[in-house]
A protein has these predicted regions:
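Active-site beta-loop-alpha junctions enriched in small/polar residues
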Residues: 9-13, 35-39, 64-68, 89, ...
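C-terminal helical cap(s) of enzyme catalytic domains, especially alpha/beta-barrels
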Residues: 98, 149, 181, 190-210
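Hydrophobic residues within beta-strands of alpha/beta enzymes
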Residues: 32, 84, 133, 188-189
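Short, acidic/polar
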Residues: 13-25, 67-75, 116-124, 173-178
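Conserved N-terminal beta1-alpha1 strand-loop-helix module at the mouth
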Residues: 1-70, 202-210
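Conserved anion-binding
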Residues: 2-6, 68-163
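Alpha-helix termination/capping residues and helix-transition junctions
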Residues: 25-28, 53, 78, 127, ...
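Alpha-helix-loop-beta-strand connector modules within alpha/beta enzyme cores
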Residues: 40-64, 98-115, 148-174, 206-210
Length: 210
């Protein structure tokens, strides 16, 4: 299994703030994510700006698409994204349309696993050609003290066995990494930890290598 990639999630409210973190951290990460909040505030220009700033990085448009998969995929990939997220609750037709456009554009679709979904859903996504999903604890779950548990790991292993590679996020610490040894991990996604590293670097502390 190849080394998991490191993804910087930019959940800023302004592009200027996001690009400051990118300047500090882009040499330490493999993937740069135009987060949902950033894209809602800054529009398609956020993806375009990050592509210009990071010509050699994988760019993710984290749009959590629920409909109009073909149209939005065309816009995302046309703006320079390599991957685009579709929410797990989207109709299978939306996933199919988005995936077909991704294939035409040389990109990939990631299924965002929020809320209710089943392994039968995952099999359907894999059957139509999708090979990536995102598994995470959301902000509210982390705030309530939810930890990575056996149920999470069992579901991730089941997804891996279906053939999906997972990007994992939700308050991961170095001590957590051994928990994922049997999982097909595509990437670990970091938000606040990497942002904190950027602030330390500004103060002269330096950014740890990814």
């Amino acid at each position: 299994m190849s080394r998991p990639l490191l993804q910087l999630a930019l959940d800023h409210s302004s592009l200027e703030a996001a690009q400051r973190d990118v300047t500090q951290l882009k040499d330490s990460v493999d993937i740069v994510e135009a987060g949902t909040i950033l894209c809602l505030n800054e529009g398609l220009g956020a993806v375009k700006a990050l592509r210009e700033q990071c010509p050699d990085k994988i760019i993710v448009a984290d749009w959590k698409v629920a409909d109009a998969g073909e149209t939005l995929a065309q816009q995302a990939f046309g703006a320079g994204a390599n991957w685009m997220t579709i929410i797990c609750a989207a109709p299978l037709a939306t996933v199919e349309k988005g995936h077909a456009m991704a294939q035409r554009c040389g990109g990939e679709i990631q299924i965002e696993l929020f809320g209710n979904w089943t392994l039968d859903d995952a099999r359907d996504w894999h059957r139509i050609g999708v090979r990536q999903a995102i598994y995470h604890r959301g902000r509210d779950a982390q705030a309530s003290g939810q930890q990575w548990g056996e149920a999470d790991l069992a579901r991730m292993k089941a997804l891996s066995d279906i053939g999906l590679e997972l990007s994992i996020t939700g308050g991961i610490t170095p001590a957590d990494l051994p928990l994922f040894k049997d999982i097909r991990v595509k990437a670990f996604i970091a938000r606040r930890a990497l942002a904190g590293a950027a602030k330390s670097a500004e103060g002269g502390g330096g950014v740890p290598a990814g």
